[in-house]
């Protein structure tokens, strides 16, 4: 694993009272580098399956009952408001307008993406065979062998590239683009309550200097925080 990934796992372990060990969680910034770089295929399989099955294990964190209740309540809500289903209710205010338009778009993407995905799978299987693997490509192999293939074909290493994109500079770049395209400006605010000490707040103004809103920058995953 890259040194940065190992250091992050050590920090997570320390935060959980396991100093001297390494902890990988099911949050994307932790699991995705593991799937991308870890040589141990059995561990990749374990963490991938844990990620896919999260919230559906036979324990106190099983969400099946909660999800069933949410789906039922959403159907009731949609029908009370005069819609045949929840998708129609949600899409009524969106550009797509209805489920049929969404399915048409998804199908167009699917038709274009599927042949490319199959070609990528064939290339990854060749890489597995070439490096002595005696198994068929599985979901937990995809990122790992895609990384190897990328290095072989293009000489690219994401870990080496990432050092040229520190968070602050990436944020400045995003603000610069927003200003050039839309005239937006961002001014950091130090007098607002924040959800976490690492979070930042920025006032957003339009090209005329008119207040538009507040942008909260809270980039890092942590326990209890929703992703996305």
Q: Model-flagged regions — what are they?
A:
Residues 49-66:
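A short, flexible low-complexity segment enriched in Lys/Arg and Gly/Pro that occurs
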């Amino acid at each position: 694993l890259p040194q940065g990934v190992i250091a992050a796992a050590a920090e997570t372990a320390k935060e959980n009272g396991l100093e001297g060990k390494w902890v990988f969680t099911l949050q994307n910034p932790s699991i995705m580098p593991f799937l991308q770089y870890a040589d141990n295929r059995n561990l990749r399989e374990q963490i991938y399956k844990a990620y896919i099955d999260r919230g559906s294990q036979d324990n106190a964190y099983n969400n099946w009952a909660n999800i069933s209740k949410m789906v039922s309540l959403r159907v009731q809500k949609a029908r009370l408001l005069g819609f045949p289903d929840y998708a129609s209710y949600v899409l009524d205010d969106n550009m797509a307008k209805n489920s049929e338009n969404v399915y048409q778009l998804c199908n167009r993407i699917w038709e274009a993406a599927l042949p490319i995905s199959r070609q990528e799978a064939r290339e990854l299987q060749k890489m597995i065979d070439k490096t002595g693997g005696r198994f068929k490509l599985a979901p937990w192999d995809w990122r790992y062998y895609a990384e190897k293939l990328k290095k072989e074909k293009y000489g690219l290493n994401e870990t080496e590239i990432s050092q040229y994109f520190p968070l602050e500079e990436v944020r400045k770049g995003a603000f610069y683009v927003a200003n050039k395209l839309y005239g937006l400006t961002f001014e950091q605010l130090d007098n607002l309550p924040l959800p976490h000490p690492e979070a930042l707040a920025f006032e957003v103004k339009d090209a005329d200097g008119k207040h538009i809103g507040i942008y909260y920058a809270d980039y890092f995953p942590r326990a209890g925080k929703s992703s996305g």
